[in-house]
UniProtKB/Swiss-Prot annotation:
Name this protein carries in UniProt: Homeobox protein Hox-B9
Region of interest (Disordered), residue spans: 22-43, 116-167
Family designation: Belongs to the Abd-B homeobox family.
InterPro entries: Abd-B_homeobox_TF (IPR050803), HD (IPR001356), HD_metazoa (IPR020479), Homeobox_CS (IPR017970), Homeodomain-like_sf (IPR009057), Hox9_activation_N (IPR006711), HXA9/HXB9/HXC9 (IPR017112)
UniProt induction comment: By derriere.
Organism: Xenopus laevis (African clawed frog)
Location(s), subcellular: Nucleus
Role this protein plays: Sequence-specific transcription factor which is part of a developmental regulatory system that provides cells with specific positional identities on the anterior-posterior axis.
GO molecular function: DNA-binding transcription factor activity; DNA-binding transcription factor activity, RNA polymerase II-specific; RNA polymerase II cis-regulatory region sequence-specific DNA binding
GO biological process, any: anterior/posterior pattern specification
Entry GO terms, CC: nucleus
Source taxonomy: Eukaryota, Metazoa, Chordata, Craniata, Vertebrata
């Protein structure tokens, strides 16, 4: 028995339950509720964030030695050492250079400029000086003081070794009479015996050692003269 087309559609629709019209996703959503739904419906309560302006304006050129001093202060917060105090004092009391103007009235010739170094505490005590080519200092007083200093240097050997003078007398152990008598004795005999040396020393008011040394020196002098004559 053959069934026509409209009838077959009717029977197929009657067999399939009316629930089939719904989508599978709707079925599963009805059986298992989505736990994220209430979470999405509730508003999220987060504390409000407020950012304060904690960053200060940074200067492009930091002060000199500032990082080194800050590092020292961080390392030694309790009791700063003597080196740190000296460094800070040196930085605080640094000298400042004050320059004079280089330009003057028209027609004046500028001479050498002098600069004064003034510290922050005693800047008022320092006076500025400028000298021009037309001004000449008085040299009379300076010449007198220079002569006096030269005399003091000459009198004081320790002041200047160029002007040092020995306070010892010139070495002259033998008088003219003693030298003449010793020369006579040397002509008679180049070598003295002990007794003769004792006698000569007694006659000339000398010691035996002085007589002995004189004869030794005289013999060396004669040998040198003979050697020079033989070379000539």
């Amino acid at each position: 028995m053959a069934i026509s087309g409209p009838l077959t559609n009717y029977f197929v629709q009657s067999i399939i339950s009316p629930d089939t019209d719904e989508t599978p996703a709707a079925k599963f959503s009805a059986q298992f509720p989505n736990p994220r739904a209430p979470a999405q419906s509730e508003p999220l309560d987060f504390p409000s964030c407020s950012f304060s302006a904690s960053w200060n304006f940074l200067t492009p050129h930091p002060p000199v030695y500032q990082p080194y001093i800050q590092q020292q202060q961080q390392q030694e917060e309790g009791a700063p050492s003597a080196e740190g105090r000296y460094l800070r004092a040196w930085l605080d009391n640094g000298p400042s250079l004050k320059s004079e103007p280089l330009l003057g009235p028209p027609g004046d010739k500028l001479g050498p400029q002098h600069y004064t170094v003034a510290s922050p505490g005693g800047a008022a005590a320092n006076t500025e000086r400028s000298t021009h080519s037309g001004n000449f200092p008085d040299t009379k007083g300076t010449e007198g003081t220079a002569g006096e200093t030269d005399r003091t240097h000459q009198n004081n050997p320790s002041a200047n070794w160029l002007h040092a003078r020995s306070s010892r007398k010139k070495r002259c152990p033998y008088s003219k009479y003693q030298t003449l008598e010793l020369e006579k004795e040397f002509k008679f005999n180049m070598y003295l015996t002990r007794d003769r040396r004792h006698e000569v020393a007694r006659l000339l008011n000398l010691s035996e050692r002085q007589v002995k040394i004189w004869f030794q020196n005289r013999r060396m002098k004669m040998k040198k003269l003979n050697k020079d004559q033989s070379k000539d």
